[in-house]
């Protein structure tokens, strides 16, 4: 299935049903009083995280989702039926953003997590609500409010503990094949990896971590060169980044400059991502002798200004790979889980009409001193008043 990690959709909640103006009519009771019911609330729109999904491709074709409108109120104090909610399933790891305001509405990081993204309109009030000692036959009602409408952007961010960084053909996919059951494509040409992939590294029966491989970066990626930097967002949730450097490039390029290219592109993408723990890993030491590899690694680290520890591995021969994985596992175990997942926005989204009915009743009470009987006509049953919310 094609990997799609972004989709823009329109979500529209249902409108609230209108209130009803009605009067009770029974035999021998000509003036039975008001019995108009309230309308029903509009349906809400929810997102539901589903661990069985791994792409947003469905929403490249279906872009509009509308919840059901609430039914209007009826006579005999019958309240209109509430509109049905609509639930949209998205992969775990989806970030939800309001395109109009840029606000992050939520981060779907848990299976079956629900997030309301559009709230249904409030129901209108029937004329029974407006009955009082000075207005025994009210002809006022209110209309239901419109449902919330949002243009939202769905962004799928992979949930991984470890992220792989490096130029094309640095050996990232080979590394994942060596340490996990994942089988990304490997070849001797650039950009063999076109979409992100995940692999689970099992150290023993109880300990494991997830590693993410993204397409390689090249100089100018921040300006759109190569595959650009759009896939770097999949590393935002990682707790540690492994920066793979080809210690003996086949094109005889300078490994120091190659490493600096990655660091520069990382800085241009996000300050937060550039400050994540990053480990330096020299790959393909099997191409040259052990002593020469050690000398080159030391020289490259000094040229980069690298002061921390670095690793030398051969992903093809699995040389040094196991020790690296155990160090990664120990590091992950010492980090709080919260580091891997950004603090998500609150799931409750505030909407502007939360106090709608309270304000409506307050307005009516404020006008209680007005003489609503001045234009009363015993013969006029059609003079309906509708209160519009400003």
Swiss-Prot record:
Residues 1-159 form the Obg domain. Monomer. InterPro entries: G_OBG, GTP-bd, GTP-bd_Obg/CgtA, GTP1-OBG_CS, GTP1_OBG_dom, GTP1_OBG_dom_sf, OBG_GTPase, P-loop_NTPase. Its cofactor is Mg(2+). Mg(2+) binds at residues 173, 193. One of its GO terms (molecular function) is GTPase activity. Disulfide bonds: none annotated. Keywords: Cytoplasm, GTP-binding, Hydrolase, Magnesium, Metal-binding, Nucleotide-binding. Residues 160-333 form the OBG-type G domain. Belongs to the TRAFAC class OBG-HflX-like GTPase superfamily. OBG GTPase family. It is found in: Cytoplasm. GO terms for cellular component: cytoplasm. The keyword Magnesium applies. Residues 366-384 have a biased composition (Acidic residues). Its main location: cytoplasm. SUPFAM superfamilies: Obg GTP-binding protein N-terminal domain, P-loop containing nucleoside triphosphate hydrolases. Residues 366-390 are annotated as: Disordered. The lineage of its organism: Bacteria, Pseudomonadati, Pseudomonadota, Gammaproteobacteria, Enterobacterales. The keyword Transport does not apply. Its EC number is 3.6.5.-. NCBIfam families: Obg_CgtA, PRK12297.1, PRK12299.1. One of its GO terms (biological process) is ribosome biogenesis. An essential GTPase which binds GTP, GDP and possibly (p)ppGpp with moderate affinity, with high nucleotide exchange rates and a fairly low GTP hydrolysis rate. Plays a role in control of the cell cycle, stress response, ribosome biogenesis and in those bacteria that undergo differentiation, in morphogenesis control. It comes from the Bacteria. This is GTPase Obg.
